Amino acid sequence: MNELRQRWQAMSQRERQLMVVCAAVLLLCVVYYAILQPWQEREDLWERTISREQQTVNWMQKQASSIPRGNQAQGDNSQRDVSLPILISQSTKRYGLTVVRLQPQGSQASVTLGQSDFNSLLRWLGELEQKNGVKVISLDVNAVEQSPGIVDVTRLMLERTDEA
């Protein structure tokens, strides 16, 4: 430490000022590259994520209008006497959906599906409601990164309104 102090005192006034300015510039660079730049990059990432999620929500809202409502149901009654779990298992195969978990709960069933095409999911739910009197109680879906139109159905609660 004494050696540094001696070197400092051996410098001319102009050299000392130059060293102080260089230290200040170095400190500003460290603050910018260690704190400000990463923060700005994260902020940009957050904005892009929000924009992408908003686009997904808008797309889902547009697609939701194509789902028929329950009071419009006028399908055939051919499968109304089939139990809800069997109906779910059979109908998901027709739409290329994969059941990961199916838990019957009286007239309701909790379903978890694998990654699914959103349009196929909507058509399947529409058919269940129109032809079989099955209503969606709750639905939790997440968009799959880098796969447009593909969703993860983490929780789907279905209820048969006219249990045979």
Curated annotation (Swiss-Prot):
Subcellular location: Cell inner membrane
Periplasmic side: 39-164
Pfam families: T2SSM (PF04612)
GO biological process per UniProt: protein secretion by the type II secretion system
Segments on the Cytoplasmic face: 1-17
Annotated transmembrane regions: 18-38
Bilayer topology annotation: Single-pass membrane protein
GO cellular component: plasma membrane; type II protein secretion system complex
Gene3D superfamilies linked: General secretion pathway protein M, EpsM
Function: Inner membrane component of the type II secretion system required for the energy-dependent secretion of extracellular factors such as proteases and toxins from the periplasm. Plays a role in the complex assembly and recruits OutL resulting in a stable complex in the inner membrane. Provides thus a link between the energy-providing OutE protein in the cytoplasm and the rest of the T2SS machinery.
Protein name, entry field: Type II secretion system protein M
